[in-house]
């Protein structure tokens, strides 16, 4: 095994590679130093002793050893051996700057370098029992919606590099959404009952997609307006955002509101191991409890209480709201993208430092900076000259 980037390329061994060596594999730091700077790597029994691998097997017994290991791991699983759930292609309708899914819409404004991401709750009553949830399969709202959201985030990240700001909106019936998620949580065994494998996997997918949004290097601003559906897991979108503006419109038939549920009490943890509410109100359990107190009776948090509770950044009336949102969008897109990537990555991950937060909340942005330094990609940089007979020339100043 080897990670030869430092001695050969003058950069780091993959995003988080070093962190995984010491945090995940538990390799001693001085041995990790040797491993990371020896181009030929570490072989055989030494790799086992240094905890880089679990075992070594000769070529003649390698397949047998792998098979035995796989069987031992399989015996620990409580997943049944029956049929899985087929996931059909999402096949969104892409029309110019708009990508339209069943429950998600992504609209790009390339000129302003902004995007609008709208996520919709279920339009009909969802299955409420374990069997009916499983029978719904890939058409289950939670599974379909979060697959679409995942796809939209990936399209945004990979195809629209110059888009720097995303407005988050939600639509739908909050009660239908809360009913659907309550049934899913029950089926997944979060209340202490028997966990159904399918419901659990759907819940884990939801957790991963929220984490993907957490580590997406775009400014996110949530807009809570009359007709929004920031309830349950969709409220997590609100607390993933870098800012949240709420419209207080006294003339609206239904005021802008936020509804919390058991989904916000730790079912979808961040990479730091805390819920988004716990991260928002770090070491302030009283504030977390005050927000979650609205959950049992599904009491809506309306504008009057939202700012007092701290669940949004600002509440503005119908006169100030449009201008304040517009000014924020204009100001944010005028700032340095590099500075914002570093700032947002640090501010989003308050609380405990974990392997996940080190890799995605710190190293991704930091390592990209190292890759653009002259020592890596300059005319005499290690990456530029890799494979040539010339030796790189380094600026030896530590920064």
What is the meaning of each model-derived region?
Residues 1-32, 231-293:
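CoA-thioester-processing core
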Residues 26-52, 56-237, 244-254, 286, ...:
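C-terminal alpha-helix plus adjacent terminal tail
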Residues 311:
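Active-site or pore-adjacent capping/gating segments
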């Amino acid at each position: 095994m080897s990670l030869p980037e430092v001695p050969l390329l003058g950069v780091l061994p993959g995003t988080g590679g070093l962190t995984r060596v010491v945090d995940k594999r538990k390799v001693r730091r001085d041995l990790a130093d040797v491993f990371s700077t020896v181009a030929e790597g570490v072989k055989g029994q030494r790799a086992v002793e240094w905890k880089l691998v679990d075992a070594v097997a000769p070529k003649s017994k390698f397949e047998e050893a792998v098979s035995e290991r796989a069987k031992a791991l399989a015996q620990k699983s409580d997943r049944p051996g029956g049929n899985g759930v087929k996931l059909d292609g999402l096949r969104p309708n892409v029309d110019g700057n708009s990508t339209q899914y069943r429950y998600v819409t992504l609209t790009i404004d390339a000129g302003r370098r902004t995007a609008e991401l709208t996520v919709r709750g279920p339009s009909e009553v969802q299955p409420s029992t374990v069997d009916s949830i499983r029978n719904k399969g890939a058409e289950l709202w939670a599974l379909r919606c979060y697959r679409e959201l995942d796809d939209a985030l990936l399209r945004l990240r990979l195809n629209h590099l110059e888009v720097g700001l995303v407005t988050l909106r939600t639509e739908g019936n909050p009660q239908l959404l809360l009913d659907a998620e309550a049934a899913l949580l029950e089926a997944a065994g979060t209340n202490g009952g028997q966990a159904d494998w399918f419901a659990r996997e759907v819940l884990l997918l939801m957790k991963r997609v929220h984490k993907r949004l957490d580590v997406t290097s775009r400014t996110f601003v949530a807009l809570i307006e009359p007709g929004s559906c920031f309830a349950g897991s969709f409220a997590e979108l609100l607390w993933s955002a870098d800012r949240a503006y709420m419209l207080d419109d006294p003339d609206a038939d239904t005021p802008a509101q936020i509804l919390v549920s058991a989904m916000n009490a730790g079912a979808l943890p961040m990479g730091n191991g805390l819920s988004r509410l716990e991260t928002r109100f770090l070491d302030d359990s009283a504030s977390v409890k005050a927000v979650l107190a609205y959950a049992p009776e599904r009491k809506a948090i309306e504008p009057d209480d939202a700012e007092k509770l701290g669940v949004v950044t600002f509440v503005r009336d119908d006169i100030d709201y449009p201008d304040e949102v517009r000014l924020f969008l204009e100001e944010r897109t005028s700032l340095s993208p590099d500075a914002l990537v570093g700032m947002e990555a640090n501010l989003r991950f308050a609380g405990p430092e974990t392997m996940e937060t080190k890799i995605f909340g710190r190293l991704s942005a930091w390592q990209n900076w190292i890759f653009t330094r002259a020592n890596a990609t300059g005319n005499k940089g290690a990456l530029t000259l890799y494979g040539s007979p010339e030796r790189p020339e380094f600026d030896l100043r530590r920064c």
